[in-house]
């Protein structure tokens, strides 16, 4: 199941790369969409929770 996490101020390649690098270290299947300022997570609610925590820990605000 696809889940969309909206990330406030995800408006630069460097920010997207920070998220990609951090999530790559997890088992989360994800895609960062810079144009729509979101992270698309494929998986169950546990995978979404992991992704949300990683994104929050990086200092990003989830909408």
Language model region names:
Residues 1-2, 52, 63:
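Extended, compositionally biased intrinsically disordered regions at domain boundaries
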Residues 24-28, 44:
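Short glycine/proline-enriched coil/turn segments at helix->beta-strand junctions
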Residues 31-32, 58-63:
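Conserved short beta-strand edge segments in small beta-sheet-based binding/regulatory domains
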């Amino acid at each position: 199941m696809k889940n969309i996490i909206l990330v406030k101020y995800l408006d630069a390649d460097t920010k997207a790369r920070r998220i990609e690098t951090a999530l790559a270290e997890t088992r989360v299947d994800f895609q960062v969409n810079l144009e729509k300022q979101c992270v698309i997570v494929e998986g169950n609610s546990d995978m979404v929770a992991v992704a949300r925590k990683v994104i929050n820990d990086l200092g990003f605000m989830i909408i």
